[in-house]
Amino acid sequence: MSWRSEHIWIELIAGSRKISNFCWAIILFLGSLGFLLIGISSYLDRNLISLFPSQQIIFFPQGLVMSFYGLAGLFISSYLWCTISWNVGSGYDRFDRKEGIVCIFRWGFPGKNRRILLRLFMKDIQSIRIEVKEGFYARRVLYMEIRGQGAIPLTRTDENLTPREIEQKAAELAYFLRVPIEVF
């Protein structure tokens, strides 16, 4: 989503609160909880889940391994839920032609660097760069090339933009910033 006027362009960036992350977190939580309950029921020799009789699963080694997988899955699931609740990666890109400043803001993980803010002068922007990698895992990423600082990604690598969409976005941004476009 973006908002544009004659002098200001604000591009909102979606973070980790995506439907796919919610789905993976739920699937991982339920699956790992099932593994952990089966491991515990094999240890207690009692049916905690009625689908699998605990007599069929011996605690050592199957129940122990399933308990380990369940705990590992719960840790990964809790990590996913934390990134979703903190909305890591969300933010905005603000291009202000009137003041000649570009602000790139992102939310990070809690701590000292929770708020990530880059302020750049528009005169330091060399170009808008499109990086295209075709093949099985095709990806197209839009970068802003800065003098002395390298390239700053403006789109996420998991955004599946079509070639037409990425070209249009790059052309509009390059026209707004009055810089050339490079394709790699």
From Swiss-Prot:
One of its GO terms (cellular component) is photosystem I. The chain crosses the membrane at residues 22-42, 57-77. The keyword Transmembrane applies. It comes from the Eukaryota. It is found in: Plastid, Chloroplast thylakoid membrane. It is a multi-pass membrane protein. Its main location: plastid. Keywords: Chloroplast, Membrane, Photosynthesis, Plastid, Thylakoid, Transmembrane, Transmembrane helix. PANTHER family: PHOTOSYSTEM I ASSEMBLY PROTEIN YCF4, PTHR33288. Seems to be required for the assembly of the photosystem I complex. Belongs to the Ycf4 family. This is Photosystem I assembly protein Ycf4.
